[in-house]
Each structure stands twice: as structure tokens, then as C-alpha cells.
Amino acid sequence: MASLKNKHFMIGLTLTFIVALFSFLAAKLPILDKVGALTIAILIAILYRHFRGYPEQYSSGITFSSKYLLRFAIILYGLKLNIFDIIGQGSRLLAIDVGVVIFSIVMMLFVNKLLHGDKNIALLLGVGTGVCGAAAIAAVAPIFKSREKDTAISIGIIALIGTIFSLIYTAIYAIFSMTTNVYGAWSGVSLHEIAHVVLAGGFGGSDALKIALLGKLGRVFLLIPLTIVLILIMRFRSSESSSNGRISIPYFLIGFVIMALVNTYVTIPSALLNILNTVSTICLLMAMVALGLNVAFKDLKNRALKPLMTIIITSICLSSLAFIVVHWLYS
């Protein structure tokens, strides 16, 4: 019995790995490189669920990917941060980033209320839009006690919209006259995922990409204080409602902070850093596959339309406002 359980666990884990690896490699191909590995992974998983059903017998391995590998990926995500660079070179961008995070969450909740959408998904999308997309959503989902299907829907939406917006940014840069500093800063402070920032920022050249990444990593850095604030708010609400559900700091966020400090104070060989970043990406993709397998098409039809409209409106407002601020500061 135990050997059969282990076999089913390994099959479930292998399934998420194969789809993740395929998505990772497919995203390096022309055209698909614009779509992004996250979007590919989630779409394949949802389509698999639709045509083959949820592989219940292999759920232990799939759940392992959606929970533990996701948290491990977020821990390694901290290696992207160098706190000295963000606070030193990117102090002006960091100030904008604070406004971006606050605006994204508040605006998302406001639009969601007008559309009578799901508040939990709106919160996840607000944090994802303001901070760093899928990783941020996955990091705060336990704090909000979000369901896996809501987390998956939010990640799928933000991956899709972020890809579309990054392509729109490149078109705007190609058509209109814009300095590399303005374009890079605008991309960095307003696009959703690091991959989206790399896609759009890289179109403006190496100087634009450098500024874009500095702006984006400032938002990733803000995940640390943001999660602390969210935990305190949820604890306060929990005590007010006399709930016994205690909100604790997720251990993987502590690991995220430790990795950020390690990358700040310790010189890690670039070859090792590249390997760790690849491992982080694969683990994150495996988690996305596992989350995507929990989403049925009827869930998308019933729960995704209003959040999709909400994030589009919020992202347009954020991009417009961010451009005005960046143009004023960098022109």
C-alpha cells in the first residue's frame, strides 16, 4: 500500500515537472517567448483538466507541487534582491514603487466593488499587480486563506494581462518618442511580472532594462513590509470577529528575507546564482501546473470575467498615472 502511494506521489510530481519543463523550453521559442512560461504552464494544466479530468489518484504529488515547491520557489526568489542596490541606486524609484503598491490594491478593490466581483481574488490581483505578479499572489494567498482555485485564477489572469501590456509597451516605445530612462522606469514600476519587465524593458536597450529591473526589484522588496502589514490587519480583523483562526507569518517569507540578505551581503558566483534562479523558475512552474489542474473551465466562466475586467481597468489607470509621474521625474 505504501509503495503504491509513493508511486502515485511520484507520478503526480513527475506530471507537474514534465509540463513545467515543456513550458520553460517552449517559452524560449519565437512568439511563445512573448506569451511566457507561466501562461503556457497554466493553460496546459487547465486544458488537461478539461479534457482528461483531475488526476485524483496522483493528487498527493500534485498537492506537494502546489504547496511545498511553491514556497521553496518563493524562498529562492529572494536571491533576486540586492537591498543595497534598491535603497541606494533606486531610492527615487522605490518611492514611486510604494505609491504603485498602494494604488494597485486600493484601485483594484474600488473597481471590484463597482463590478460586484470577488473580494478575495481582487485582493490577490491587487497585490500581484502592485508587487511582482504570481510570486506575490502565492506569497499572500495563505494570509488571506485563499482557495487554490482562486489563487490559480488570479495567477493566470495576471500572467495573461501582464503579457498583453508588455507587448503594448513595446509598441508605444516604437511609435512614440521616449527617452530610455523614462521608458525603463515606466516599465519597471508598472508592469506585473519580472518577465514582463524584461520583455518590455529589453526592447528599449540595456540602459532601459537596467532601470526597469531596478524599479521592479524595488516592488519585490516591498513584498516584505507589505506582508507584515497584511498579517497585522488580518490579525486585527480576526480578533475583532472573535475568530480563533490565528494568522501567523508564513515561514517561506522568512526564508525569502534571509535569501535577500544573503544575496546582499554574500558574493554568490554568477554560475551558481543562475542555477538557483533556474531551479526557482522550474519549481514555480511546477506549482503553477498543480494550481492550474485545480481550475475547471466553469470556474473561469463563473469567476474570472469580473476579475479580468477589474485588472484591465486598474492596469490602464496604473500605467497612465505611472507614466505621468515617471515622465515628470526623468524628463
Swiss-Prot record:
Protein name in the entry: UPF0324 membrane protein SAS0317
Major location category of this protein: membrane
Family recorded in the similarity comment: Belongs to the UPF0324 family.
Protein's UniProt keywords contain Membrane: yes
Cellular compartments per GO CC: plasma membrane
Sequence intervals crossing the membrane: 9-26, 31-48, 69-88, 93-115, 122-144, 154-176, 183-202, 217-234, 247-269, 273-295, 308-330
Membrane keyword on record: yes
Membrane topology: Multi-pass membrane protein
Keywords (A to Z) from UniProt: Cell membrane, Membrane, Transmembrane, Transmembrane helix
Domain of life: Bacteria
Subcellular localization, as worded in the UniProt entry: Cell membrane
